[in-house]
Amino acid sequence: MVSVNLPWELVEEILYRVPPQSLARFRTVCKQWNSLFDDNKFVNDHLVRSRPQFMFRTDSKMYSVAVNFSGPWIEVHELTLDIPGLNCEMPIWLYNYVDCDGLLFCTSYKFKGVLIWNPWLKQTRLFASNHHYPTKYVIGYDNKKRYKVLDYEFEPSSKLTIYEIGLYSKKVKDLESDSSWSVVQSNSVSLNGTLYWAGVDVNNGIFIRSFSFSTERLTTFCRLPLKYNEDNILALAVFRKDRFSLLKLCNKTSKIKIWLTKNSINNREIGLVEDVVWIKLMTVLIPDFPKLPFRWYNRPDLTYFLDNDDAKRLVICCYDETQQVYIYIVRRNIVKKIKIDLFEDLLDQSSPHLRTYIPSLVRPTQVKEDNNKLYVL
């Protein structure tokens, strides 16, 4: 049989669509394939094309849930955190965790520092510190790709504190938040290192607020295409790594509306932005959709994504009133409901433990350090 060499551009296009856990096994095929893991362009392009998954933890374990639309059906994987030389348990390190560009940043109530973890590449990096990281925090990075932690409360006149990961004991700066900002109404998302939230100002307007780690400024990014209603639940998501989508759930009617920004989002340092155009993508009514409790801060009860290849396919993961986890796949007027069967009870829902996660080839070793108080595991 005569071997056929495909054009390298076609090989890359195929590999873009292969999940990270499978790509990791292909590193031994040839040097050229192995070099892709060090190619920033390939890593970034793969992240754009990677299909989001759901992640959640129980009292003792952590799981990822991949959705396959051909059935549809789901794959549930238990994620293990095995760190040689460090006596740790999964519940301790997953006391709180956030994600940024496919990396999980985990904090422990027993260890002072932060663990950076890519569960698909099975790579971790542990940064020691002389302080515990806050319980409410989000992760982003500045224009030099230095990862930083934002400690936030987002109440009038509350302080915003920045910590730089890789510095052993440096608290960068305390910042006063804008007192006109009333309450955070959605989860936070990170886009190109900048953080975004949906929320309400004192005049009941609905906006997206942003925080830039490059300028250390908290600003109003744009107005949202809806009115404030305390019965609504909002969720913000990144679509194809360059646009925002917004989900609004009316808890009374179970009607769900989805908007999508028309154009790519740039990290613009401006005040109120009126030129962000939102397109109403769909309105759906899911029968017997659970009634979700109201929460002021990052809602752990509902998370979602839009299919990268078909923006009008909506996938939602949420709890019902009995804390059972379900996935809803919505395309036009067809709704598929899939139960996630687990043998242990979920954590108290006050814990932020249900998330959308994008598998990536980003390695923890790409996080820079400025001191020798570092463990590479």
UniProtKB/Swiss-Prot annotation:
SMART domains: FBOX. Residues 1-46 form the F-box domain. InterPro entries: A_thaliana_F-box, F-box-assoc_dom_typ1, F-box-assoc_interact_dom, F-box-like_dom_sf, F-box_dom. It comes from the Eukaryota. This is Putative F-box only protein 10.
